[in-house]
Amino acid sequence: MRIRGVKPFASAVGLLLGLLYAVDAAKVNKHKPWIETTYHGIVTENDDKVLLDPPLIALDKDAPLRYAGEICGFRIHGQNVPFEAVVLDKSTGEGVIRAKDKLDCELQKEHTFTIQAYDCGEGPDGGNMKKSHKATVHIQVNDVNEYSPVFKEKSYKATVIEGKKYDSIMKVEAVDADCSFQFSQICSYEIVTPDVPFTIDKDGNIKNTEKLNYGKERMYKLTVTAYDCGKNRASEDVLVKINIKPTCKPSWQGFNKRIEYEPGTGSLALFPSMHLETCEEPITSIQASIMLETNHIGKGCDRDTYSEKSLHKLCGASSGTVELLPAPSNSANWTVGLPTDNGHDSDQVFEFNGTQAIKVPEGVVSTTLKEPFTISVWMRHGPGGREKETILCNSDKTEMNRHHYSLYVHNCRLVLLLRQEPTESESYKPAEFHWKLDQVCDKEWHHYVLNIEFPAVTLFVDGGTFEPFLVTEDYPLHTSKIETQLTIGACWQGGSARMTQFFRGNLAGLMIRSGKLENKKVIDCLYTCKEGLDVQLPEEVASAVKVEFNPNQSSLSLEGDDIESFEKVMQHISYLNSRQFPTPGIRHLRVSTTVKCFNEETCISVPDSEGYVMVLQPEEPKISLSGIDHFARGAAEFESVEGVTLFPELRIVSTITREVEVEAEAETEAEGEDDPTVQETVVSEEIMHNLDTCEVTVVGEDLNGDHESLEVDLAQIQQRALEMSSSNVGMVITGVNTMANYEQVLHLIRYRNWHTEALFDRKFKLVCSELNGRYISNEFKVEVNVIHTANPMDHANNAMVQPQFISQVQHASVDLSGHNLVNTHQASVVPSAATIVIVVCVSFLVFMIILGVFRIRAAHQRTMRDQENGKENEMDWDDSALTITVNPMETYEDQHSSEEEGDEEEEESEDGEEEDDITSAESDSSEDEAGEQEDQQGSSRQQQLEWDDSTLTY
């Protein structure tokens, strides 16, 4: 018998039991695993096993339940941790930490990270897994002695003096790359070479075991090795060279005999590593003098090599200075015959050998000098004979031999003769001033300046003043109308018409300035060298050493009692050349030293040290002149007051070319590594410097002053402190100034010609230079052509012609420059007499063709009008009185059209096909003129002459 309701009851009971079982199961994994809070481990590099303290064991209170009480794994936290944790036994929770890859102690000695244990959850799927807290793990990597010692240097050198035993000659040092203290330390060094008188300690100090003998051995070569504390020997032994010097000799050490100076680099230290070897002798004081010998450079040293007149201006001298020994030029040619000693790197000087003399032209210096006045000159003169040697002399030109004023040398004395002009009083007055000077006969260059303000005369020699030791008196000169002659290098004897008292030596920069004395500042500036010695005293030794210079800084003297401070000052002595383009060559250098000791008997003697400064050749600037070199202008422009500008777009550019080293990285195809190589590249660099002369010269016939000239605005010249001189061969602009200022002045030079009938072209040449001709530009040649315009044949008839029927001859190129000139060499048009004749003939021929065509066209129009019976005519022409006059010399509108039409006209002349060449350009030109006329009349419709030449016969 089945009981109803049992089945539903059983289901309810089963559901209840399932819920109870689920709740029970949810409480199975109740606890988290547990591990220690900190672990310390050790691992040896190149091994993966880590020894942990304490061991890695995770515990779970849910044990021994399966899953919930088991440890399934460990998880490591941290970035780039080179370790992993592995479970060895799930039930016991035992695990290990091991390295993923081989470790390197040299890269990292210690590693720190965190670790966490997790159980297996409540079943195989790991559900409801629990994690322990995070524990910190510190692992130290133990070193392996895998590296050998390596010496810091590839080789070692030392120098010792014979006969001495040293505590330490030198020290060698090796390093080991191992990371541990034990294996990275060098425990010992060893000299491998047998039977040598040297030993080495554990710190690498080498010393000699006996006194060394220079005669026995001048150099020892030792092989040294090293051992680390793990007994590893150095991978490579090192070579040690010990030089033996003879017994100590006091001298300056670290002195380079050759010192190269590159222009433009400022000051150069001469003795940067210099020190005094005293051989351990106690020194109480020391003195030294440093001499820079520059007497062979220029006039005693390196100075700017501009003309003496330019140098006076640069030094601030006022105007009125006259240069009596200028460089030969078109405007100053009286020095042409004199031998010169100029290499363009230095000043231009004139040589007098006792047979040459020159006469200064009249007008260069006034006959009677206004007082006060100044005479200045550079002179080099050796011991002479008993004869007087005249530098400058102003004497009677004819009849008599009176010397009005004279500067001469006699028995190593410099003498100024100054005779007074006739006066009412006949009393004695000072006439001769004598100076006895060593400089007059020492064969060296010296600068002499005489400031004369009668009766006082002041002499400056190399910037220093000298008083005359003797002054003699004489009567004033007698009244005479005889003219005087100014000579240089001898004195003119007017009575016998010959030269006498010839000079033997060298002169340069002979100047006279009347009306004003030269001030001391200008004199010092003229004499000051652009090169010399310099010293920047360190503050700590400035008071310990006394330093003195001579006036031109070619020598200095030092004095002190502390050797260390003295050496520091010596190391700061430098050579300086402030010129942009210095004179290259050798400057000898000498250091002379004296010392004082406590014991004078055994005091040392320091020999002189000698060397030289080699001033290298400066990069030579290339001065380039460029611009429009060919153009044409109408004759009217040449005849106008303004004239024609010769250099409207002139550009002056200076460049230097130098070699520079460039590092280039080239990848090797085989290894793919960078292979840096050094390449030399030539680069051109624009620089700025001054110019001192620009000369415009006529190419061809000289200028005819009756009808042509070169002109420039003198106010603009003076505003830029320049000077201009002109002659029939051209124009010279002088003065030290910037390239930009010279450019502006050259833009203003104009050529005028007020009789151009027979002139068709003129050619000019421009050359600029720097440093008195040391650097010269290219020759910039300019050709200007004259465009002649023919006179109209009949102005009245020409005015009557309608513009539609005037065939325009397009404008010949008036200006082949600027925008119209594409290439001044390839596309220039040069009108000439032959060209003008051709244009006239062709224009007349074209005119006849147009006239013939016009008449044929008119006849054809009348025929058509008769056939159309009353039709309104387009045009009605009455040519019975028609006269057309065309100016055959009408200029072309542009150069391009001129060239095209010129080619067409040549083809017409050659082929005889003139009738077929009525071009559309000519028709267009007629139409354009017609349109202009109608615009002026206010017409809204443009009338054009349309030709139908389909029925024309020729």
Curated annotation (Swiss-Prot):
UniProt keyword list: Calcium, Cell adhesion, Cell membrane, Cell projection, Endoplasmic reticulum, Glycoprotein, Golgi apparatus, Membrane, Postsynaptic cell membrane, Repeat, Signal, Synapse, Transmembrane, Transmembrane helix
Expression tissues: By 48 hours post-fertilization (hpf), widely expressed in the brain, with strong expression in the telencephalon and the midbrain.
Positions in the Cytoplasmic compartment: 855-954
Identify the stretch annotated as signal peptide in this record.
1-25
State the source organism's domain of life: Eukaryota
Q: Pfam families from the entry?
A: Cadherin, CLSTN_C
Glycosylation site list: N333, N353, N552
What is this entry's stated membrane topology?
Single-pass type I membrane protein
Annotated membrane-spanning segments are 834-854
Q: Where is this region: Disordered?
A: 891-954
- Is Cytoplasm among this UniProt entry's keywords? no
Q: Which residues lie on this side of the membrane: Extracellular?
A: 26-833
Name the major location: membrane
User: What biological-process terms (Gene Ontology) are attached?
Assistant: axon arborization; axonal transport; endocytic recycling; establishment or maintenance of microtubule cytoskeleton polarity; homophilic cell adhesion via plasma membrane adhesion molecules; positive regulation of synapse assembly; positive regulation of synaptic transmission; regulation of collateral sprouting
Which positions fall inside the Cadherin domain?
Answer: 35-151, 152-252
Q: Where is the composition biased (Acidic residues)?
A: 900-935
Question: What GO cellular component is one of the record's annotations?
Answer: cell surface
Function (record text): Postsynaptic adhesion molecule involved in vesicle trafficking; required for branching of peripheral but not central axons of sensory neurons. Promotes synapse development by acting as a cell adhesion molecule at the postsynaptic membrane, which associates with presynaptic neurexins.
Subunit architecture: Homooligomer and heterooligomer; mediates both homophilic and heterophilc interactions with clstn2 and clstn3 paralogs via cadherin domains.
Family affiliation: Belongs to the calsyntenin family.
Q: Which protein is depicted?
A: Calsyntenin-1
| UniProt source species | Danio rerio (Zebrafish)
Q: What is the lineage of its organism?
A: Eukaryota, Metazoa, Chordata, Craniata, Vertebrata
